[in-house]
Amino acid sequence: MTDKTSLSYKDAGVDIDAGNALVDRIKGVVKKTRRPEVMGGLGGFGALCALPQKYREPVLVSGTDGVGTKLRLAMDLKRHDAIGIDLVAMCVNDLVVQGAEPLFFLDYYATGKLDVDTAASVINGIAEGCLQSGCALVGGETAEMPGMYHGEDYDVAGFCVGVVEKSEIIDGSRVAEGDVLIALGSSGPHSNGYSLVRKIIDVSGCDPQTTLLEGKPLADHLLEPTRIYVKSVLELIENVDVHAIAHLTGGGFWENIPRVLPENTQAVINESSWQWPAIFTWLQTAGNVSRHEMYRTFNCGVGMVIALSAPEADKALALLNEKGENAWKIGIIKASDSEQRVVIE
């Protein structure tokens, strides 16, 4: 036994020093996201967070998500700065549609070989997303797993917890015939449909870094971070009686809008109320994608759809546009027993 080489964890492909260096790199940006309810600092076995005292009957709302194969595109193009924003956005946008205020966020970062610069870039993006949504980044897990991922490839997952007053939960149960539907413009494909995006790029033979669309590289359009609607929507909820909110993610219009509709109602979308952003027109043309498939796969320029009573619509539009959103009336709710829950005409 004495003549054998002494092995270390680093020999097995796990660099603890690199992990410690990453923690030192991110401490500053993580601290900026802190909320007054958070107790303790980074590095504990668990993160502690008190409930905000303003809630009389608080209900916790939780969510988890990733960014799908947008991550593959980001890795191929070596652009990691916005992926963290995407990760937070996918989680907090899901929470706020139920009326919840995001409280804290945790991330999971897994890789075959830890590149401190890449990981720090991703986590800086996560911190930025948390700042945009008023959410505290309270911890995470960085897992270096040689043999599980190819080289420095990585994957990320996010976990978020928010809180809503029990009496103010938004669940779509009050959606009624005559309600107006308001759209919030998206920043691009957000974090959905990227397996099809990558297939279209492959089939078309274009280089996303040199192919120009509206004067900038296609890559810029495709890697534009997912818009975070939290602060705008929370202010809307405080001032307007909102009946339902749908976050248009995987499944697009056909699958996400029905998730907030009661039985015997139908969302009628006016397709002429907006123009698809150029990236969606390019994807449809380059991939010869059908209209139905576009609306099933992509948000086509609409990040959220909000249902509220008709008399509240103008007030809601004014507030949302004042907050910097691109908001417009996109449709109405009709009474219907049809199996087709969404009609786009």
Swiss-Prot record:
Q: Which reaction does it catalyse?
A: 2-formamido-N(1)-(5-O-phospho-beta-D-ribosyl)acetamidine + ATP = 5-amino-1-(5-phospho-beta-D-ribosyl)imidazole + ADP + phosphate + H(+)
Q: What class of enzyme is it?
A: ligase
Which BP terms does GO give this entry?
'de novo' IMP biosynthetic process; adenine biosynthetic process; purine nucleotide biosynthetic process
Q: Which residues form the signal peptide?
A: none
Tell me which Gene3D superfamilies the record gives. Answer: PurM-like C-terminal domain, PurM-like, N-terminal domain
Pfam families for this protein: AIRS, AIRS_C
Location comes to: Cytoplasm
Query: What keywords would UniProt list here?
Result: ATP-binding, Cytoplasm, Ligase, Nucleotide-binding, Purine biosynthesis
Q: Can you name this protein?
A: Phosphoribosylformylglycinamidine cyclo-ligase
